Amino acid sequence: MVSTNIENRILDKIITSNFTKRELKVLLLIMRFSFGLNRDFAVFDKKDFFLAGILPYHVDDILKGLVVRGVIKWNPDKQMFGINKNLKEWIDRKQKADQF
């Protein structure tokens, strides 16, 4: 049986953060295709977020919001997505973040 290894400190931070349902689905999808394949980044098209039930017209807003808050790293040119492991850079929704 294969498993996805996620550091407890990352899970703890996700649990204690105020993410929307869509943001959580995006994070889980990125973790599955990065950590689940023993990689730091997942590589897939934005249309693949439909696997998590995210409609295409929501994807950009969700990704930009997570990038602005420092939760994910995103290279739009290469379609690479990764969880920012430096949890000190994460900004809670309650804190003010500069817009993308």
Feature map (PLM): residue ranges:
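Short, leucine-enriched amphipathic alpha-helices that occur as contiguous helical runs
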Residues: 7, 23-27
